[in-house]
Amino acid sequence: MGSSSSKSSSSVTVASSIDYKAKPTIDELGTSNYSGGLEVSKNLLDFNLGEKPCPLKSVVQDQFTISNSSKTKLKFHFEPLQPKEFQLSFSPTSGSLDKGKSKTIKVKLMVNQKINTNHKVVLRVEGGASHFLTVKIRCETGVFGVDPNTLEHVEDEGFRVPYILALMKRSLIDNGGLQQEGIFRLAGEQTEIKRLKEAMNRNDFTSSTDINTVASLIKIWYRELPTPILNSIPTEKIFYSTDIDECVQSAKNLPEPQKSLLDWLMHLLLMVSSFSDVNKMTAQNLAIVVAPNLYDVSSSNPMEGLVLSQKCVQFLHNVLSHKVAVHKRESVAYEVLS
């Protein structure tokens, strides 16, 4: 989700040097030139809590190892990060690592208020690629960042989904969201996003006229799932399913509740794309802004993560394009029969 709330009137354009139809080579994934860099033992920091809530005002700890498999000394540092909701520290915060050596990084976290989030931390390597670590924080029950099976479900246009999704969709539609230019691309105001998210977690939300905020919260809901939707599909299926039918079949083979959650979302995006002449959000544009919320691309190999991110966009575009094509055929058939 983007951070800008500017209401630009231009449509999204796409420019990519990646050939989606070509299978990625070893060089494309960065494997061949990455073996001589900094390696990280794990990318998810959950402080050994699993699904247990993180305590407030108490320090929890985790650790991981970085190793230098290059032929030269490497310098590294963690980018400064001090959100007001929590304190996070790495020890050491910077340093150097001789070739062939390893170092243990100790991590301390203290949460000041109840939040559910997956926070990204950047580990920079001088003259090399960056690493992205995910800090998993779960402090409260609610509707964001929790197992969807624990939420109240309803039937929404043939899909069984958590009640909060149906509520946000109704708010979006009732307030003209389907016709809003840049819907799902333009971000809502951060203060309003936070306020409404907290209200939803308290089960104290009915509707909102700020449709960009509601659209942002739908993306956030998917992004903060304990297991992102597309992570339930084998990685090789994302990389190599260049054929639309293969992508559709992979989506159909998803386990529940991921399958219903993806089907519901695709139906909503289909509705949005049907007004693309007004809202400027085609299937391709929607895939670009929504796909990053459906897959956690954290990887010890940043280049692989970059390629995988683009493959996820193409995967989602293929699935959505199929639904658009089916909808058009059914509409034509209905008109003929009428």
From Swiss-Prot:
Gene3D superfamilies, per the entry: Immunoglobulins, Rho GTPase activation protein
Keyword Thylakoid: yes or no?
Answer: no
**PROSITE patterns per the UniProt record, alphabetical:** RHOGAP
- Note the CDD domains from the entry: RhoGAP
Q: Where in the cell is it found?
A: Cytoplasm
Occurrences of domain Rho-GAP (ranges): 149-327
Q: Which InterPro entries match?
A: Ig-like_fold (IPR013783), Rho_GTPase_activation_prot (IPR008936), RhoGAP_dom (IPR000198), RopGAP1-5 (IPR044785)
Q: Does the keyword Cytoplasm apply?
A: yes
Q: Which UniProt keywords apply?
A: Cytoplasm, GTPase activation
Q: List the GO molecular function terms.
A: GTPase activator activity
Where is the site described as Arginine finger found in this chain?
A: R185
Entry superkingdom: Eukaryota
A GO biological process of this protein is: signal transduction
One GO cellular component assignment for this chain's record is: cytoplasm
Q: What's this protein's function?
A: Rho GTPase-activating protein involved in the signal transduction pathway.
The name this protein carries in UniProt is Rho GTPase-activating protein gacA
What organism, scientifically named, is this protein from? Answer: Dictyostelium discoideum (Social amoeba)
Which gene name belongs to this protein? gacA
